[in-house]
Amino acid sequence: MASLAAANAEFCFNLFREMDDNQGNGNVFFSSLSLFAALALVRLGAQDDSLSQIDKLLHVNTASGYGNSSNSQSGLQSQLKRVFSDINASHKDYDLSIVNGLFAEKVYGFHKDYIECAEKLYDAKVERVDFTNHLEDTRRNINKWVENETHGKIKNVIGEGGISSSAVMVLVNAVYFKGKWQSAFTKSETINCHFKSPKCSGKAVAMMHQERKFNLSVIEDPSMKILELRYNGGINMYVLLPENDLSEIENKLTFQNLMEWTNPRRMTSKYVEVFFPQFKIEKNYEMKQYLRALGLKDIFDESKADLSGIASGGRLYISRMMHKSYIEVTEEGTEATAATGSNIVEKQLPQSTLFRADHPFLFVIRKDDIILFSGKVSCP
């Protein structure tokens, strides 16, 4: 699975830098894996330059290990299917919903084999709709479907005015995550602290506290500490906390560097006193501008798109690509009482390393080596 892990990570970090540059130092949160799967869904029916641009953006030859199109297609599909099967197998340990839907104006007829592949491989919804005559009903129906699929967690993925009656095809991608820590933070130890950020001027944030053994690495270049916070279900959050400027870390984010920084040989199990903010980030992105900037242009251009493998009825292109993501980080774990008892014992031990996340930081959430989410907290 290393090849998909590498391709997804490079896609993730390239996209992160592009999105961060356009956020004005605000919070960033998205799921590279769900976007990777959404674009792989489009790739199933893409041809010529549309296909090659997707392949380049997703590093498909890296993901598949093969150079030609048919082998890379099957290699990519099989690896993604295994990843999602693995994620869903541990679903009882966390709340994770990933939703992909492709909605095209009714004059286009989806190819039967495309619908079957989309549903089988990516559990995606593929549907003909009436943007032209029933725009508001269509918008509400899409929103209701996403809300149902995410158990009410993600609502109004397409806001009023979010699509027009001239829309041809809309790609909707939504993801919700809430995990439970292996070792919960104790609510009584959460305190209000100042978060040192221009975006948080004068704002007090709820800072969780815990002192016990964590995996921690100290990196000299760029200067930072990386803390591993474990969720149930084999999912880990890695918090990249800079000593100085966060941009020094952002500029060096690559799959190879992240693997080196978080290598078990490098991360030492030690007593750490952790101060970590509660935060909730909900983002609704129109992805076209970011993906165009990274070279994926043709699928959004009526005169250039070749998505003839998806449907018949004329030149098909993507009018809108929506990505809505939601994460909530609280004290919650499997057994708060067990964590409390552990805290009492470990606080008697001296020489803890301090990890105080009271200024902007990056985080990556992984299952094994596959990045599920990445984000930046400028103000909790």
Curated annotation (Swiss-Prot):
TM region positions: none
Keyword field: Cytoplasm, Palmoplantar keratoderma, Phosphoprotein, Protease inhibitor, Serine protease inhibitor
InterPro entries per the UniProt record, alphabetical: Serpin_CS, Serpin_dom, Serpin_fam, Serpin_sf, Serpin_sf_1, Serpin_sf_2
UniProt keyword Cytoplasm, yes or no: yes
CDD domains named in the record: serpinB7_megsin
GO terms under biological process: positive regulation of collagen biosynthetic process; positive regulation of glomerular mesangial cell proliferation; positive regulation of platelet-derived growth factor production; positive regulation of transforming growth factor beta1 production
PROSITE patterns cross-referenced by the UniProt entry: SERPIN
Tissue expression pattern: Predominantly expressed in mesangial cells. Expressed in the epidermis of the whole body.
Positions where Phosphoserine occurs in the chain: S217, S223
UniProt-annotated location(s): Cytoplasm
Marked site (Reactive bond) residue numbers: K347, Q348
GO cellular component term, pick one: extracellular space
Main location group: cytoplasm
Disulfide bonds: none
Signal peptide: none
KW Cytoplasm (keyword) present: yes
UniProt-listed SMART domains: SERPIN (SM00093)
Functional note: Might function as an inhibitor of Lys-specific proteases. Might influence the maturation of megakaryocytes via its action as a serpin.
Illness association: Keratoderma, palmoplantar, Nagashima type: An autosomal recessive, non-syndromic, diffuse palmoplantar keratosis characterized by well-demarcated diffuse erythematous hyperkeratosis expanding onto the dorsal surfaces of the palms and feet and the Achilles tendon area. Hyperkeratosis is mild and non-progressive.
Similarity comment: family membership: Belongs to the serpin family. Ov-serpin subfamily.
Protein's UniProt name: Serpin B7
